């Protein structure tokens, strides 16, 4: 459920995390899920099939996108898109002026115009079965356009636990990689994107 606090804006759940007030009802769980799936799919995977034009950096026209969603969901209002984006704790989407895009997770071919990460190390969580292959060959994107790395050990472990019960965390020597010309783009406070990570920059963090 998405609600709106007059002081702190849109939030998910029953009360504002900052002031604990209930706020104004905006969107129920069912509609939030439907919109979320469509927004994610369109901005990351199938913009053309959904009927929206995407530029080289992943931006689409917000008003045109809303029109497409209104045709699909007759209850759709532009406020719902703002509510979905602004209440998303993972920061998956970005609105700038009258444009909207996904920050990460793309399978479509887009270019990254984010700033370079200044973290000396970034992290990648893997299953025990993957580790030897990664240390030998490096990390390459599989279903997504870019390799997704985490800015902290904890975040890497959190992501890896979705896929394996016993994650192994690899540390990436980001400083040395960038010195050697590998671009590491900061998509959010927690996610760094790269074309690939060669094996010479990878180290297993021993528990």
Curated annotation (Swiss-Prot):
SUPFAM superfamilies given in the database record: ADP-ribosylation
Protein keywords: NAD, Transferase
EC number: 2.7.1.-
GO MF term set: NAD+ poly-ADP-ribosyltransferase activity; tRNA 2'-phosphotransferase activity
InterPro entries: Ptrans_KptA/Tpt1, RNA_2'-PTrans_C, RNA_2'-PTrans_KptA, RNA_2'-PTrans_N
Residue ranges crossing the lipid bilayer per the database entry: none
GO biological process: tRNA splicing, via endonucleolytic cleavage and ligation
A Pfam family it matches: PTS_2-RNA
NCBIfam families on file: PRK00819.1-5
Record family assignment: Belongs to the KptA/TPT1 family.
Role according to the record: Removes the 2'-phosphate from RNA via an intermediate in which the phosphate is ADP-ribosylated by NAD followed by a presumed transesterification to release the RNA and generate ADP-ribose 1''-2''-cyclic phosphate (APPR>P). May function as an ADP-ribosylase.
Protein name: Probable RNA 2'-phosphotransferase
Organism expressing this protein natively: Methanosarcina acetivorans (strain ATCC 35395 / DSM 2834 / JCM 12185 / C2A)
């Amino acid at each position: 459920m998405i609600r709106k606090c007059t002081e702190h804006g849109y939030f998910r759940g029953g009360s504002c995390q900052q002031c604990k007030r209930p706020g104004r009802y905006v969107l129920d769980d069912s509609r939030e899920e439907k919109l979320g799936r469509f927004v994610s799919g369109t901005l990351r995977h199938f913009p053309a099939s959904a009927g929206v034009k995407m530029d080289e950096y992943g931006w689409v026209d917000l008003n045109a996108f809303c029109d497409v969603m209104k045709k699909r969901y007759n209850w759709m209002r532009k406020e719902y898109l703002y509510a979905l984006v602004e209440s998303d704790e993972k920061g998956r989407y970005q609105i700038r002026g009258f444009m909207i895009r996904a920050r990460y997770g793309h399978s479509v071919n887009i270019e990254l115009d984010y700033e370079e990460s200044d973290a000396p190390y970034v992290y990648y969580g893997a299953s025990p079965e993957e580790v030897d292959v990664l240390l030998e060959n490096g990390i390459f994107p599989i279903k997504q356009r870019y390799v997704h790395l985490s800015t902290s050990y904890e975040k890497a472990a959190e992501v890896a636990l979705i896929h394996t019960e016993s994650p192994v965390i690899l540390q990436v020597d980001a400083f040395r990689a960038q010195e050697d010309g590998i671009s590491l783009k900061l998509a959010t406070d927690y996610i760094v994107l790269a074309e690939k990570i060669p094996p010479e920059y990878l180290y297993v963090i021993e528990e």
